[in-house]
């Protein structure tokens, strides 16, 4: 079982007298920066010269600098730009501005685990990864609560890397909920597997296959969408709130019986074998290599083509029309 840490295990005073540069001001960046600021930490924000987020940073009471300048000013650098942009940004703006004793931080292990970023030996390399979207990290903090987070230490040059990870996690509010210790490798491999086999790849293909099966059998696309796609949120919310037991308690006995007798016909031994292959391709770096090549290709043509093809599926058109009926979805 994972070991849990809380605010009582963290020493936020370790961050006193240090400057934290949060690189990026998107979903996670704005939450980290504002939470740290409200925790009394000296925070600056690093952005590209052309970033449109500078005004928002200033409106939030923070100071924005070009990424290279922010990195040079900082003792702790948290990189919160998309994975595919991190390596180039690191080489162009951060690497030459690192000093011995600095702390380099990430919220996902991809670029360290797959050696797209190789920091010098005299800096700490740490992960602090909240297990929730940035707006939740921020809103929970403001309400006096927090979102659980993972911490990991890849390189402990200072001898205090774990303590710094805990301090930072506490500063963004994670210590109020719970902090779990992991490794860069474990976080990276499980995160990628969960996305590909279950949360994104697995779920979308399952919903799409169900929709297509009903439509091919002559059922109305709108009914197929309701039964195979729209109602997914109802089930996931129940599981999120109380696990499979809560979900099964809340659904009809007919649905529960169908769960038991049919689920294993859909997720078969062959499916599990394929899942193991997917995991192996993540572990041995095959997936990462393919994704890195894709991002280096001009225009990311294959990726854009797949995105376009999926956007043209019938379920997208049907769903868009049905969502017009749902007043609670309208902002």
Curated annotation (Swiss-Prot):
One Pfam family per UniProt: KARI_C
What are the BP-aspect GO terms? isoleucine biosynthetic process; L-valine biosynthetic process
| The EC number(s) this enzyme carries | 1.1.1.86
Binding-site residues for NADP(+), renumbered to this chain? 25-28, 51, 83-86, 134
For the keyword Metal-binding, the answer is yes
- Give the catalytic activity: (2R)-2,3-dihydroxy-3-methylbutanoate + NADP(+) = (2S)-2-acetolactate + NADPH + H(+); (2R,3R)-2,3-dihydroxy-3-methylpentanoate + NADP(+) = (S)-2-ethyl-2-hydroxy-3-oxobutanoate + NADPH + H(+)
Q: Name one GO cellular component term.
A: cytosol
Query: At which positions is Mg(2+) 1 bound?
Result: 191, 195
Superkingdom:
Bacteria
Spell out the molecular function terms from Gene Ontology. Answer: ketol-acid reductoisomerase activity; magnesium ion binding; NADP binding
Q: Does the keyword Membrane apply?
A: no
Keywords, A to Z? Amino-acid biosynthesis, Branched-chain amino acid biosynthesis, Magnesium, Metal-binding, NADP, Oxidoreductase
Q: Report the co-factor binding details.
A: Binds 2 magnesium ions per subunit.
Enumerate the transmembrane spans.
none
Ranges of residues in domain KARI C-terminal knotted: 183-329
Q: Which ranges carry the KARI N-terminal Rossmann domain?
A: 2-182
Q: Indicate which residues the UniProt annotation says bind substrate.
A: 252
The metabolic or biological pathway listed in the UniProt record of this protein is: Amino-acid biosynthesis; L-isoleucine biosynthesis; L-isoleucine from 2-oxobutanoate: step 2/4; Amino-acid biosynthesis; L-valine biosynthesis; L-valine from pyruvate: step 2/4
Q: Which residues bind Mg(2+) 2?
A: 191, 227, 231
Q: Which cofactor does it need?
A: Mg(2+)
Q: What does this protein do?
A: Involved in the biosynthesis of branched-chain amino acids (BCAA). Catalyzes an alkyl-migration followed by a ketol-acid reduction of (S)-2-acetolactate (S2AL) to yield (R)-2,3-dihydroxy-isovalerate. In the isomerase reaction, S2AL is rearranged via a Mg-dependent methyl migration to produce 3-hydroxy-3-methyl-2-ketobutyrate (HMKB). In the reductase reaction, this 2-ketoacid undergoes a metal-dependent reduction by NADPH to yield (R)-2,3-dihydroxy-isovalerate.
Which family is this sequence assigned to? Belongs to the ketol-acid reductoisomerase family.
Name assigned to this protein: Ketol-acid reductoisomerase (NADP(+))
Q: Which gene encodes it?
A: ilvC
